[in-house]
Amino acid sequence: MATLMIIWGVAIVAYCLFWAWYVGFGSKVSEQDLNRYMACVEQTELSEESVASFRNFFANDDGKEFFMVNLLRLKEPKNESRQLLNKYTSIFVGKLIKRAGHPYFVGLAQARNIENLNCEVVDGWTRTALMRYRSRKDLGELLVDTFRSEHHGFKLAALEKTFAFPASAILNIGSVRSLVGLVIALIAAVTHIVLVN
């Protein structure tokens, strides 16, 4: 019985620690944070509309995770652009993972637009990427760290055009929280069986 309690106690503690890191505690963007993030954003070459979107997104923080939907079109020659983008990605994703974010889906375009209804004609995408962020505050800190950095220059040099917008999940059948919970439970169950038998 004592062994059983220790095994499952450790499993519960491990998952709680993971949850605290991966989900966080709902820390929201403060007014001071907002001013710091926007001071950085306003130094870029983004349009006034994009800058306003950033401000609105940060100002209405709900403290929850979100996903950034990205569409990318590489410059020619694509091999050279792909290498530059990979350099940027390796650095950026490393910083993202430290803040409990990660790539959720990355894919290559298999055709030109199949549907384009009542919107500007934007076509010829090379790839798409869905990136998970723990919070808007994490995005802000990453922006401060990334804008005007050398690795951000790799991204700008690689892309002919890009399109991105944040989204919150209303249906997510591939939750990392559930996966990690199942893995920890499986390890605990196997450990219990091995030690008891």
Enumerate the language-model features and the residues they cover.
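Short amphipathic alpha-helices within nucleic acid-binding modules
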Residues: 80, 134-151
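Hydrophobic alpha-helical transmembrane segments
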Residues: 123-139
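Conserved short beta-strand edge segments in small beta-sheet-based binding/regulatory domains
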Residues: 151-167
